[in-house]
C-alpha cells in the first residue's frame, strides 16, 4: 500500500492525531492506532487525554512496578504479567502499550527508578524481554523505553548525557539489545535527552547504526511525549512517530524537506511503511473477556515472589497463629503501592494491610496511625503508637517513602525515610523490641535503622494486591524468595555519582564509566548495607557439584531447610588479569528454582552472546578476550558458593590505555581532561548563561531579560513549592519546569508552530517587538498552513 500514498500522506503518518492516537488515512483504509501508558497496568484515560495521568483512567489491574518484579528474578513470572497486561490492553482497545521501562539505575536518586528494573543490564534485559513477549502474544505492541542513557528527571528534556562508547554499549544499551534480539518489540520509545550532543530521537548512531543496523529492529520508534526536536532530522536518523500531536507543522516541514532535497524520500517512505504496518496489524485480535479476580491473584503472586526479606533476627518471622500484633503506620491503613506520574493506574481493587490481617490468624490488638504522611513528627500520634506497641507481642510497623519522595518529573534529594517515621521507629522500638517493619519504596532507602528492628520485609511498590502478599509472607503462608535487583549502600556518599546527580547544567557527564551499582561498590572496596542479589528465606539452600563446559555451567541446589522455598541462583563472570579495564565481576546468568524440603535439583545456566564479550571502542566492535575466566555461582553478588575456571578462546588485546589508570580515574570520577585523553571524548562546556534558547527548559526563565517571563518563573516555582509542601506533587508543574520552549510546539495540538516558538523565546529574552512580530506572523502562517494541508489531505480521501 505504501506505493499508493502521496508524499503528504506519508508525512502525515509520522505524527500523532491527538494525545494518544496516530493519524489515520481513511481514503486508504488506514486506521489510527491507540497508545496508552502501561508499564505495570493499563492507563487508558476516560475522555480527553493528558500525558501525565491527571485525568481519570479506566480501571485496570495495578501490578507491582518493574522495580518490584525485578526482585523476583523470575522470567516466567514476568511473562505472565506481560500476558495479563496485553489482555487488558486488548480489552480496552489499546493497540500499543508504552512499556516496559528499562533505563539503568545509575543513581538511587533517580526520581523514576520505581519504573525501571535494575542497576544491571543483563537482569533488566531478560525480564523486560519476557514482559514484551507476553504483551505481544496478546496482539498488542509493546514499547520498551526510554532509549537511551536517560537517567535523571531534572532537565530531562534538554540534558545532554555525555558517556563513552564502551560504557554506553555495555551498560546503557545492553538491556535494549537483549529485548530487541529476544522479543522483537514492534515499537520502541526514544528518550527526551541528548546523547553525546544529539537528541535521542534524531540520533543516527543510536537509531540506524545500532538499533536497526546491528540489532535488526524493524518496528516503530516513537518519541516520548513532547520529545521530538527536529522532525526532519528524526526521520533521517531512523525515527518514525512524533507524539503527542504537533499539528501539521511537522508534516509541512517533512514535505518541504523532501521537495528541497534535504530529506531523501526513501527515508520518509521507509519510516511511513513501518508506521503503516503497525496500524494495519492492530486490532486483529478479538477483544478478550478479562477475569479480574484471576488478574488480581496474579498481581498478588507477583508481589509475593518479589518482596525481599532483608532481616529476620531470632527467626521472628513467620509469625505464629495467635500472635498479638499492634498494627502501626499511616501506610498500614492507606498503602503506598505505586509511583506517581504517567504510569499511575486506577486499580480494579485495592487491599489494605488492615483488611489483609483480618483473616490471617494473627490477633490484631490495636491500630495506630503513628505519623502523618507528609508532616513533621506528631507527638500525639506517636504516643498512641507507643502505647499500642507496648501492649502487643509484636509491633508491625509500616514505613516507606511518601508520594512526593519519588515521582516522574523530579529526582530525589536524599535516600532517607521521612523524619516522622524514623522518630516513630525509635519510640516504638524502645517500647517493644519485637519490631517488624514492612517497607514500601520504589527505590533504595537508607536502612541504617535496621538494628532497631527484628525483621524487615521490603515490599517495594507492590501493586493493588501487595498488602495480601505481605501478610501471607509474614504468617508463613508463603516463603520469601525475592532478591534485591540493586545495591543498598551504607550511605549516599558511597554511590558513584554522589555530588553530581542530578546534573544541574546542560550536560550530565557519566564520569563513573563502567562502575555503577555493585560494579562500583566492589571495585572501590566499599562495604554495603545489602548487596545486589541479597534476600533471605525461611529455609536454607546449599550449592554443590559445579561442572563447566564451553556452553554452560551446571550445579546442584538443595533445600536444606524444613519448609518449601525458592532460590535465585546467580552466575557471575570475572576476568583475571584482563588487558582492559573491567569490573570485579558481572552478572551473566540466573535461575529461580522452587524446591521442597530436602529436594535437590540440577541447574543448568547456558552461556550466551553476552557472557564473555566486551566492547572495543577503537574498532567499534564487540570482542572476546583470549584467556581465563572465573565462573562464580552464589546466592548474591557477595554470597558466592561455587567457583570454577575455564579458558575462553578469543583475541589477544594490546590496550592503548592502562587498565589500572582508567579504573582509578573512573572510580574517582573522570575529569574533563581524562575524558579527552583516555576516552577521546571532548566534554562540552556547561555554561548556562546569556540569552535563553529554544531547547532551554522553562525552569531557566529565572534568567530571562523579560520581567514578565521572570514573573512566570516565580509563579512556577511558587506552585511547585506549594505542591511539595502538601506532599502532593503537581505533575503538570514538574513537567513544565523541565519542558523546553520547543515543546510548546509539540504539546499544544498544533496551536503553536516552531516559528512561534522562536518568537516566544525572543519575548523571554526581552526582544519584545521582534518576538511579538514573529509570534503574530507565525500564528497566521501556521493557521493558513494547517488549513491548506487539511484540505489537501481531505481531498486526497
Annotated model-derived regions:
Residues 3, 256-259, 387, 619, ...:
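Polar/charged alpha-helical tracts
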Residues 1-613, 628-633, 637, 749-750, ...:
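Glycoside hydrolase catalytic-domain context in secreted enzymes
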Residues 682-797:
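Long, compositionally biased, glycine/small-hydrophobic-enriched stretches that function as flexible linkers
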Residues 609-655:
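Terminal connector regions
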Residues 644-714:
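Charged, amphipathic alpha-helical linkers/stalks
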Amino acid at each position: 500500500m505504501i506505493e499508493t500514498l502521496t508524499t503528504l500522506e506519508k508525512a502525515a503518518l509520522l505524527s500523532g492525531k491527538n494525545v494518544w492516537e496516530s493519524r489515520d488515512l481513511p481514503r486508504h483504509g488506514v486506521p489510527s492506532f491507540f497508545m496508552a501508558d502501561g508499564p505495570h497496568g493499563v492507563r487508558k484515560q476516560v475522555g480527553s487525554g493528558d500525558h501525565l495521568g491527571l485525568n481519570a483512567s479506566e480501571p485496570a489491574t495495578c501490578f507491582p512496578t518493574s522495580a518490584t518484579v525485578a526482585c523476583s528474578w523470575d522470567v516466567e513470572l514476568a511473562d505472565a504479567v506481560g500476558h495479563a497486561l496485553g489482555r487488558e490492553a486488548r480489552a480496552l482497545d489499546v493497540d500499543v502499550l508504552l512499556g516496559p521501562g528499562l533505563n539503568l539505575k545509575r543513581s538511587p536518586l533517580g526520581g523514576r527508578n520505581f519504573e525501571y528494573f535494575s542497576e544491571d543490564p543483563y537482569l533488566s534485559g531478560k525480564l523486560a524481554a519476557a514482559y514484551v513477549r507476553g504483551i505481544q502474544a496478546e496482539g498488542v505492541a509493546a514499547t520498551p523505553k526510554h532509549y537511551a542513557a536517560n537517567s535523571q528527571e531534572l532537565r530531562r528534556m534538554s540534558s545532554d548525557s555525555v558517556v563513552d562508547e564502551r560504557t554506553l554499549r555495555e551498560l546503557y544499551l545492553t538491556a535494549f539489545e537483549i529485548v530487541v534480539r529476544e522479543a522483537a518489540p514492534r515499537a520502541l520509545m526514544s528518550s527526551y535527552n541528548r546523547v553525546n550532543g544529539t537528541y535521542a530521537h534524531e540520533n543516527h548512531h543510536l537509531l540506524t547504526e545500532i538499533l536497526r543496523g546491528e540489532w535488526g529492529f524493524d518496528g516503530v520508534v516513537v518519541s516520548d511525549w513532547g520529545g521530538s526536536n527536529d522532525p526532519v532530522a528524526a526521520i533521517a536518523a531512523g525515527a518514525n512517530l512524533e507524539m503527542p500531536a504537533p499539528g501539521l507543522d511537522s508534516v509541512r516541514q517533512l514535505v518541504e524537506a523532501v521537495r528541497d532535497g534535504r530529506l531523501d524520500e526513501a527515508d520518509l517512505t521507509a519510516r511511513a511503511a513501518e508506521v503503516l504496518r503497525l496500524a494495519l496489524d492492530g486490532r486483529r485480535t478479538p477483544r478478550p473477556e478479562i477475569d479480574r479476580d484471576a488478574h488480581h491473584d496474579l498481581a498478588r503472586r507477583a508481589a509475593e515472589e518479589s518482596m525481599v526479606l532483608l532481616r529476620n533476627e531470632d527467626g521472628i518471622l513467620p509469625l505464629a497463629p495467635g500472635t498479638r500484633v499492634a498494627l502501626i503506620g499511616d501506610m498500614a491503613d492507606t498503602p503506598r503501592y505505586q509511583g506517581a506520574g504517567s504510569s499511575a493506574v486506577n486499580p480494579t481493587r485495592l487491599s489494605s494491610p488492615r483488611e489483609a490481617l483480618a483473616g490471617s490468624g494473627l490477633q490484631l490488638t490495636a491500630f495506630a496511625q503513628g505519623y502523618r504522611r507528609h508532616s513533621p513528627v506528631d507527638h500525639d500520634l506517636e504516643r498512641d503508637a507507643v502505647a499500642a506497641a507496648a501492649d502487643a507481642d509484636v509491633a508491625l510497623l509500616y514505613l516507606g517513602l511518601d508520594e512526593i519522595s519519588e515521582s516522574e518529573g523530579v529526582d530525589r534529594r536524599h535516600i532517607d525515610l521521612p523524619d516522622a517515621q524514623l522518630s516513630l521507629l525509635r519510640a516504638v522500638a524502645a517500647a517493644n523490641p519485637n519490631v517488624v517493619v514492612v517497607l514500601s519504596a520504589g527505590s533504595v532507602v537508607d536502612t541504617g535503622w535496621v538494628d532497631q528492628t527484628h525483621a524487615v520485609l521490603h515490599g517495594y511498590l507492590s501493586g493493588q494486591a501487595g498488602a495480601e502478599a505481605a501478610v501471607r509472607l509474614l504468617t508463613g503462608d508463603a516463603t520469601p524468595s525475592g532478591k534485591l535487583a540493586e545495591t543498598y549502600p551504607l550511605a549516599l556518599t558511597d554511590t558513584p555519582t554522589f555530588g553530581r546527580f542530578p546534573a544541574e547544567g546542560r550536560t550530565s557527564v557519566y564520569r563513573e564509566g563502567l562502575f555503577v551499582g555493585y560494579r562500583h561498590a566492589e571495585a572501590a572496596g566499599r562495604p554495603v548495607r545489602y548487596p545486589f542479589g541479597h534476600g533471605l528465606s525461611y529455609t536454607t539452600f546449599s550449592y554443590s557439584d559445579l561442572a563447566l563446559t564451553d556452553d554452560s555451567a551446571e550445579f546442584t541446589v538443595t533445600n536444606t531447610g524444613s519448609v518449601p522455598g525458592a532460590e535465585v541462583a546467580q552466575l557471575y563472570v570475572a576476568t583475571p588479569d584482563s588487558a582492559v579495564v573491567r569490573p570485579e565481576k558481572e552478572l551473566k546468568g540466573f535461575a529461580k528454582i522452587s524446591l521442597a524440603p530436602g529436594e535437590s535439583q540440577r541447574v543448568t545456566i547456558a552461556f550466551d552472546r553476552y557472557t564473555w564479550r566486551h566492547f572495543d571502542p577503537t574498532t567499534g566492535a564487540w570482542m572476546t578476550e583470549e584467556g581465563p575466566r572465573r565462573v562464580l555461582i552464589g546466592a548474591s553478588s557477595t554470597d558466592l558458593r561455587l567457583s570454577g575456571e575455564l579458558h575462553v578462546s578469543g583475541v589477544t588485546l594490546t590496550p592503548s590505555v592502562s587498565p589500572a589508570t582508567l579504573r582509578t580515574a573512573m572510580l574517582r570520577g573522570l575529569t574533563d581532561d581524562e575524558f579527552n585523553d583516555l576516552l577521546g571524548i571532548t566534554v562540552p562546556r556547561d555554561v548556562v548563561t546569556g540569552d535563553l534558547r529554544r531547547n532551554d527548559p522553562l525552569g531557566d526563565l529565572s534568567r530571562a531579560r523579560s520581567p514578565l517571563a521572570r514573573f512566570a518563573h516565580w509563579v512556577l516555582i511558587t506552585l511547585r513549592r506549594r505542591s511539595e509542601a502538601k506532599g502532593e506533587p503537581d505533575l503538570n508543574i514538574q513537567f513544565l519546569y523541565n519542558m523546553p520552549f520547543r515543546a510548546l510546539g509539540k504539546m499544544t495540538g498544533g496551536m503553536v508552530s516552531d516559528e512561534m516558538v522562536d518568537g516566544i523565546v525572543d519575548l523571554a529574552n526581552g526582544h519584545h517587538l521582534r518576538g511579538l512580530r514573529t509570534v503574530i506572523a507565525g500564528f497566521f502562517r501556521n493557521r493558513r498552513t494547517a488549513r491548506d494541508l487539511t484540505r489537501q489531505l481531505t481531498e486526497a480521501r
